[in-house]
Amino acid sequence: ACRACEYCETGWETLCERQHNTGYSVNGTYAEYAIASAPFAGRLPDSVDFVTMAPILCAGVTVYKGLKETEAKPGEWVTISGVGGLGHVAVQYAKAMGLHVVALDIGESKLELARSLGADLALDARADNVVAEVQNATGGGAHGVLVTAVSPPAFAQAIACARRRATVSLVGLPPGDFPTPIFDVVLKRVTVRGSIVGTRRDLAEAIAFAVEGKVKAHVTPRPFDDVNAVLDELRAGKVDGRISLTL
């Protein structure tokens, strides 16, 4: 980021219009070494394992910031839509932040994973009564909803699961548009907020949770030669947790 615009000067460098993003405007990091701007490089303790820490620097800070954007307070409820590579980390961050968690997904293995990570309630998002169950469990709806899922029904469901004056934070990037149930948004005064990765401050905080052992991504190391196969598996939705490519 430029460090000189109104966004950078107020701590919102992720909104800088002149920022560079690896894999987009500059080369990515499918390499043994990469050049980074020192002021924007995260600091890791010598004791950490790079393979297990790698997802924290992307998925971790993304969901941590997304949870902060819901403005849910300790003791309140958040619903996390999607328990995949992002969502399984989000459950852990939410619990570490003192929040009660309802996890939604469509696979029993994902729901079992959410329960094992501390979710107070894990529900099949396809069930006819899932919204009613969320409303009942949370006493009127979640105070915050984090949407990591990329299916259009997940967004409408997120609005339905939110209580009045809740904030729905969107971190997933699905193709196309998400239809908005505007009647519910207006009537319940729900805030819908996009969130993209996180700032340097967010990154430092996300790393701290992981270093203290409160958050640990499920990582499968794979050799770099498998890169194309891994990408195919990602597109097919066959990856649980995260994969770290090793050289």
Provide a role label for each language-model segment.
Residues 156-160, 200-247:
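C-terminal hydrophobic helical "lid"/dimerization subdomain
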Residues 71-72, 138, 161-163:
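A generic alpha-to-beta junction signature in SAM-dependent methyltransferases
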Residues 172-188, 200-206:
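Rossmann-fold NAD(P)-binding glycine/threonine-rich loop
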Residues 1-41:
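Glycine-rich phosphate/adenylate-binding loop and adjacent beta-alpha elements
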Residues 133-143:
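A short acidic, Gly/Pro-enriched loop at the edge of an enzyme's catalytic core
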Residues 46-128, 132-133, 146:
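Mid-domain Rossmann-like dinucleotide-binding core that forms the NAD(H)/NADP(H) cofactor-binding site
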Residues 127, 149-150, 172-173:
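Short glycine-/small-residue-rich Rossmann-like dinucleotide-binding loops
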Residues 166-167:
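Glycine-centered, small-residue-biased loops immediately flanking beta-strands
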